[in-house]
Amino acid sequence: MKTLLRASLALALSLTAGVAAAATLTDDLGQQVELSHPARRIADAWYAHHSLLMTLGAGDLIVATVNHPADRPWMFKVQPSLNQALQARGKTFSSEALVARGVDAIFVPAQDPDAISYRQAAIPTLSMRFDDVASLKRSLLTTAQVVGTPQAQRRALAYNRYLDTQIAAVSAQTASLSEAQRPRVLHIQSLRPLKIDCSQTLIDSWIRLAGGRNAAAEVTGNMKEVSPEQVIVWDPDVIIIGAGAGSLEASPYAALFSGLKAVKQHRVLQNPSGVFPWDRYGTEVALQILWAAKQLHPQRFARLDLIAATRGFYQRFYDYPLRVDEAERILAGLPPISG
């Protein structure tokens, strides 16, 4: 952790010092990447990473995307320039198509096998990964270095301060909670098949920051397939259904899970979803922490106005004047009204 903090501090200092015409950057896997100039035409092969570029005010630099309007309607509404971007089929771009579009940097998720072909095409390729708050902040600073504008630098630092402030505000209310007062939360990423998010993930981080305990903490990693019998053994106090996973009532497990504590006490929640699902790997995790804290400890966060917080975030970091009704739909995990 100390090493990560030192690296983040070094990144922050380099950002405030200005951006050189050419630079050698270090991606999230520790690989050195040469950039001849600040990126102006970016391909993004990691679904979640788009929200980082948008937070930096650089969403309009994305000229190739793995996201699609049908899957991420809020993303394309808030950042309409994505409609003109090259849209990948699946997770893979043609290197030739990227070169033809003049792409000068591409972000890929860690362990993406296509990174090899992008590098062979001489496209600066940065492998990105974060699984907690500290590494998210580091990734944002690295992304700002790639963009290389004073605005991106300022916004990266501003977002990181904002995230720290939200965490501090929530922690002030939850720090005194005993272990017994922290509900056991099961986060279900998929109902068909049944997949959950466990420890050593960003999901586990926001559960704990919001004053909960991960019911699946004995398992590590994202989107782990489990048996319904294991869920019954865990018997969580709260179940959070990930955006796009459907409803528990309409799932094959409705009857089987009817005896769970969370179901009997009506504490099965649908997660909000905006530019990206709040519960996953994007900058809206700052809002997710607030939302989760209010769901887990409503009395302690009775005065927290989630609609106001959501609207303020979208205006500040996405430059989008979100209406009240739009914020309500995002909080309910609903897409924008078409038309």
Listing of model-derived features with the role each one plays in the protein:
Residues 1-9:
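Bacterial N-terminal signal peptides that target proteins for export
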Residues 17-20:
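N-terminal signal peptide c-region/cleavage motif recognized by signal peptidases
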Residues 23, 32, 114-195, 216-218, ...:
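Extracytoplasmic substrate-binding proteins
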Residues 28, 84-96, 219-228:
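Short helix-initiation/N-cap motifs at beta->coil->alpha
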Residues 44-101, 105-111:
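A short, structured surface patch at a secondary-structure boundary
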Residues 92-102, 121, 226-235:
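Short helices/loops that flank or line small-molecule/ion binding pockets
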Residues 196-222:
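Alpha-helical, coiled-coil/dimerization segments enriched in small aliphatic residues
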Residues 205-206, 217, 223-246:
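Ligand-binding pocket segment of bilobal, Venus flytrap-like solute-binding proteins
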